[in-house]
């Protein structure tokens, strides 16, 4: 099983990098993890809707160029389906059991995802109706994937 996580923007703060590294290390026992960061567009508070759409489209082109054709794609969206940890574990396990050997999770930038990325998505997943910084979301996602593997294996981490 290979899992790719594509994010818009780079992790800059050391504490986020340390958390990501810790979960990537833990996940190594279960899966090959690939982290892909694509450049984000410059953002300002006074961007017009048109400018935001152009920025999202440019980010979408970068994201989609990194998505493999054979990958099952999850996009993280506020309006996606909310699952608890056990349900996410079952979702991932079901994909593995039906021959999906490559899962890709996509986290958008500060303006969200362009429709082209959502159109490529096989599953819109939501962790909350709230918005989180993409740096934090990357750590939360990695933790939940790790928790999911522990649940699948019947290991005690999730209790």
From Swiss-Prot:
Catalytic activity: pseudouridine(1915) in 23S rRNA + S-adenosyl-L-methionine = N(3)-methylpseudouridine(1915) in 23S rRNA + S-adenosyl-L-homocysteine + H(+)
Alphabetized Gene3D superfamilies for the sequence: 3.40.1280.10
Sequence positions that bind S-adenosyl-L-methionine: 76, 108, 127-132
Key word Cytoplasm present: yes
Keywords: Cytoplasm, Methyltransferase, rRNA processing, S-adenosyl-L-methionine, Transferase
Keyword Aminoacyl-tRNA synthetase part of the UniProt annotation: no
GO MF term set: rRNA (pseudouridine-N3-)-methyltransferase activity
GO CC terms: cytoplasm
Subcellular localization(s) per the UniProt record: Cytoplasm
Entry's family note: Belongs to the RNA methyltransferase RlmH family.
HAMAP family assigned: 23SrRNA_methyltr_H
The name this protein goes by in its record: Ribosomal RNA large subunit methyltransferase H
Native source organism of the sequence: Macrococcus caseolyticus (strain JCSC5402) (Macrococcoides caseolyticum)
């Amino acid at each position: 099983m290979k899992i790719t996580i594509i994010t818009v923007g780079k992790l800059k703060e050391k504490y986020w990098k340390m958390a990501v590294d810790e979960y990537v290390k833990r996940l190594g026992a279960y899966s090959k993890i690939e982290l892909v960061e694509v450049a984000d567009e410059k953002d300002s508070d006074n961007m017009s809707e048109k400018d935001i759409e152009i920025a999202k489209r440019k980010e979408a082109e970068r994201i989609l160029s990194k998505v493999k054709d054979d990958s099952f794609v999850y996009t993280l969206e506020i309006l996606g389906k909310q699952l608890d940890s056990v349900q996410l574990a079952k979702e991932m396990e079901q994909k593995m059991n039906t021959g999906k050997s490559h899962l890709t999770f996509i986290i958008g930038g500060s303006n969200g995802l362009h429709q082209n990325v959502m159109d490529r998505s096989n599953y819109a997943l939501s962790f909350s109706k709230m918005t989180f910084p993409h740096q934090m979301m990357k750590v939360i996602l990695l933790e939940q994937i790790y928790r999911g593997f522990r649940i699948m294996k019947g290991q005690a981490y999730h209790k």
